Amino acid sequence: MLNLETLKNELNPQQYKAVTTTEGAILIIAGAGSGKTRVITFRIAHMLDKGIPQSQILALTFTNKAAKEMADRIKSLTQKKLQNLTVSTFHAFGVKVLRADIDKLGYRDNFSIYDETDRVSLIKECGRELKFSPEAMDIYMIGNLISNIKTGRKNWDTSNDMYRPLYESYQEGLKLFNAVDFDDLIVLPIKLFKEHPEVLAKYRERYKYIMVDEFQDTSHQQYEFMHLLADKNVAVVGDDDQSIYSWRGADYQNIINFEHDFDVTEIRLEQNYRSTGTILEAANGVISHNTNRKDKKLWSGNGAGKPIEIFMPEDETDEADFIAESILGIACEEKRKYDEFGVLMRSNSQGRFIEEAFLQNNIPYTMSGGTSFFERKEIKDVISYLRVIANHDDEINLIRIINCPRRGIGRASIQLLNDEANLQGCSMWNAMISLVQRQESPASETVKEDFSEFMKIIEEHRQKLLTGRGLSQKIRQLIEDINYKDYLLTEYSKNEKAVRFKMKNIESLLNSIEVWENDPDNDNPNIFNYLNRITLMSRDNEDENDKGKVNLMTIHASKGLEFPVVFIAGAEEGLIPHARSVEENNGDVEEERRLFYVAITRARDKLLISSCRKRRHMQMVSEVEPSRFLDEIPANLVEYHEPKTVTIEETGKMFGDFLQQLKSQM
């Protein structure tokens, strides 16, 4: 039970105010390391202890990892089952809304959610049908344009109007395939709420208390979504100084919009529990140069700590060697484990030299942004089968699996299917039925048999997978029935090691499904909910295999993390701030400064920054200037160093000493 006395003992005065102010519109400005998650979870636990029903509370955040952590902490605090409490990402909640009422927009409730691979496939298909030239098919640019038009971030004009037919074809394709993309998971619920007020009224009646985490990262559409849902009891938690995602639609001006649209009580959390005083003074010094911000000053009770060290290596090779050697030295001298180090970069391209130095020095590391488990071919194949079983009209995934494993349905047969679908104005699945059943069919008897075999497999397993429990066992049977292992052996020329690796991945998938369906909090473990889950699953899940390794990542990827020792690599003009932000001069430099601020505030005990004198770009070596942000750190907090050249013998001795220390700890 979280009585008020307990809360006073557990929280500082501002946190206590944020937790116990449960009525009205609340803006909680939570600086880096100020105990934001603690405040959110204590606040919800306090509301439950006050007798507010779980079913009336909606907490929205941005990643599945954050949502799970939040729910786990609330459960631990309250010792209650949370079956009726909604803690969700924006997109997952959008799916929930659409599954219940998307029929009002002309879709069926078994719609597919297209991931980036599916989306790219559809864009390419639309481009081919409209006979766009290869030069005009810049998939990255077109994908961004479609997203920006759909979400209202951009309008049609003379510079992009040539792509209007492709956009319309893409939208028609989604509707035809009974599919939605990620943008639709916010855009369509807004459309639903506006066009069908009775649907909105249902959710406003249920959710009397709404909380939004990482509010500075909300887009215009997410703000509108929240604004439509919220009545009067809404609390948002964020920090305008950590708004670093404008390139994907985030708008920290939503904080100002919130103050305009609601009668707001503002509470500021400025006590930092993570970093030393020196690190916070440096962060405050840098961010104070931004003009469009809420004035705040982080402070710490952790003591001043060590000065910030800035190194000026000759080039990126020297920089990488300096980082590797420093990690070896600090790990040895301060008895630190490798996973206590974070190496942060503005761009992934900086990582190549650092990775080489780590390999040469036998430093284990993990780099964020590798291939997602769910993007591996064998996993994608299995999931595509499940998508088609759940939604026959999902043509992107149907085309992927119709000849996987190979069953004689080649390009000519697929083209025949496509032509028939266009002629009949129906889905490819219905075209397949028509071709098989018609007497006067352009399909040969062999092609008909191939189509029939495929449809039989899908229909048989549809009957099994859509009824009852035991999802993992039914999927295992599907994999056996299509002889997927034999297919892999053929595809990989009987390379049994590669096949074992891929089958092991499939086994991991099946095990994860089994764990998910047996979770006591999972009251409806059906195929639709599973497909929702994996499509929305963030790539932010921590891999257990990454324990004991140095963390190498972009600054963007480091948001929300902390490390005892942090290196910021490449603090140079052109990298941070990025050259593009300086050239465009449209406020982007302020976002770059916020990015540097985020990097600084990841550090707990020790911060080291490197700024090269020269850097390679486009096969040319150029002199570079230190980042302007270095000059914004108060001079009394900084020690400048020339990189020390460490001999091979010294490195070997440090490594040997480190191994001895590890042995003594075992």
What residues fall within each predicted segment?
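Acidic, low-complexity intrinsically disordered tails
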Residues: 1-4, 639-666
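Conserved RecA-like helicase ATPase core segment
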Residues: 2, 7-8, 46, 220-316
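A basic/glycine-biased coupling hinge at the interface between accessory DNA-binding modules
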Residues: 2-6, 23-26, 31-34, 45-207, ...
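N-terminal pre-P-loop "Q-motif" helix
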Residues: 7-23, 221
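Short glycine-/polar-rich loops that comprise or flank the Walker A/P-loop
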Residues: 24, 52-56, 81-84, 231-233, ...
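Helicase P-loop NTPase motor core
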Residues: 28, 32-40, 54, 102, ...
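Hydrophobic residues in beta-strands of the RecA-like P-loop NTPase core, especially within AAA+ ATPase
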Residues: 211-215, 237-238, 568
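Conserved helicase C-terminal RecA-like lobe
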Residues: 351-363, 376, 383-636
